[in-house]
């Protein structure tokens, strides 16, 4: 198994859920990638190399503070990129 940052998957899922309700902003792949990168730069990395590590990190997702932190940074990233798209 390769080393990967599981936070990328968490942020991607949160971003997709958040964008479902947004109809007044650009949702092109460039903007989505910028939003994801912006949020990831503000959140701690969650590197995993095993199934056990992935499961442990997945369990952290149910913690209210963890979810709130991810949602806060995703919301900020959406606002920031929407105001200043790079295309």
List PLM regions with ranges.
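Charged, amphipathic alpha-helical regulatory modules used
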Residues: 1-87
């Amino acid at each position: 198994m390769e080393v990967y940052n599981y936070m990328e998957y968490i942020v991607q899922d949160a971003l997709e859920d958040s964008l479902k309700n947004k109809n007044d902003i650009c949702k092109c792949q460039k903007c989505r990638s910028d939003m994801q990168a912006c949020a990831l730069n503000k959140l701690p990395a969650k590197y995993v190399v095993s199934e056990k590590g992935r499961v442990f990190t997945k369990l952290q997702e149910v913690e209210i503070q963890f979810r709130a932190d991810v949602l806060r940074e995703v919301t900020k990233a959406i606002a920031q990129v929407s105001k200043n798209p790079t295309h």
